[in-house]
From Swiss-Prot:
Keywords linked to the UniProt accession: Amino-acid biosynthesis, Cytoplasm, Histidine biosynthesis, Hydrolase, Magnesium, Metal-binding, Zinc
Family note: Belongs to the PRA-CH family.
GO CC annotations on file: cytoplasm
Cofactor: Mg(2+); Zn(2+)
E.C. code: 3.5.4.19
Organism: Acidiphilium cryptum (strain JF-5)
Enzyme class: hydrolase
Protein's recorded name: Phosphoribosyl-AMP cyclohydrolase
Residues involved in Mg(2+) binding: 78, 80, 82
């Protein structure tokens, strides 16, 4: 049976929906990635977050090679049904660069500034 969130979600023309990962206990925004119906279903059934990699064209199980997994605490669908919020327990850095989160470049009037 298809989970109701998959039925309610408004996927784009490629069958994807943006998902924002947020540390459940601090509220820190960690990253944004894409999910499809299969990755949503897997995340809900296993409790480990799974995304869809657009560059590789396949499921991307977060932390599969790095060990920096995300345990799904809660999943929320926004009011328009076109974005997911994943409340997660992050193990290690969330960003592939090794940064704790993917939002470490502040936009200023003069350009970009790296922040911790």
């Amino acid at each position: 049976m298809t989970h109701p969130v998959i039925t309610a979600a408004r996927f784009n023309e490629a069958g994807l929906i943006p998902a924002i990962a947020q540390q459940h206990d601090t509220g820190e925004v960690l990253m944004m990635a894409w999910m499809n119906a299969e990755s949503i279903a897997e995340s809900l059934s296993t409790g480990q977050v799974c995304y869809f990699s657009r560059s590789r064209g396949k499921l991307w199980r977060k932390g599969e090679s790095s060990g920096h997994v995300q345990r799904l605490v809660e999943m929320r669908l926004d009011c328009d049904g076109d974005t997911l919020l994943l409340l997660v327990e992050q193990t290690g850095p969330a960003c592939h660069t090794g940064a704790h989160n993917c939002f470490f470049r502040r936009v200023t009037k003069d350009g970009l500034e790296e922040i911790a």
